[in-house]
Amino acid sequence: FSSRESDKVPCRDISIQVDHSTDNFFVTEDDVMDMILSKGDSLKGSPITLIPIGVYERHISANPSVKRAEVYTKHNGVFAVKVYQREPILRVFNSEGQSFYLDVEGSIMPTSKSYTARVPVAMGYISDKLFEMERYNVKTMSASLKDISRLDELFELATFIKTHERWKSQIQQIRVEPNGELTVIPTVGDHHILIGSTDKLELKFKKLHLF
């Protein structure tokens, strides 16, 4: 197509692809279509070259369940969107009953009304609140914030569990004790296992495996 010819090509279709490779369904194709329509513009029939791709890309990426959105147009008049979802690693219930996720990047992620991820759950003496912590990443927390937050150690333990297939299938609950120590609760049996801090996790779980 010459540039003059492509200017005349109308938007004929909208193609949406959501990456579900992590087995998460926080965002569906219908959700993305709703995000597009919420901008209030009628895409179909509009000249494909005049559609503000960046505006739509930023709008979709602003969804708290979206990690990244790629928006582009094709010469045949297709407006295409590919969405990558954030991947939760742990669901946290704080002392006040509020709930949120930690994702694999260490960022706070709100829960969804339509989907619940199958990840370990942390509860107990956790004072962290979503509205206070959502702008932080546990990997870059200051030392003073780590002193009062439990999220950095919970993230470290949840990451360890996720990357070890044996423990990933056996541990679905973590409890923060009044003194800040961590206890894991296996899916089978009626026993609680005190881990303490996250120091030397590899060694602690190796001993647990031998036991």
Predicted regions and their residues:
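Charged, solvent-exposed interaction patches on well-folded alpha/beta domains
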Residues: 1-18, 38-47, 51-58, 62, ...
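Extracytoplasmic "Venus flytrap"
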Residues: 22-23
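An acidic helix/loop motif centered on a single conserved Asp/Glu
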Residues: 27-40
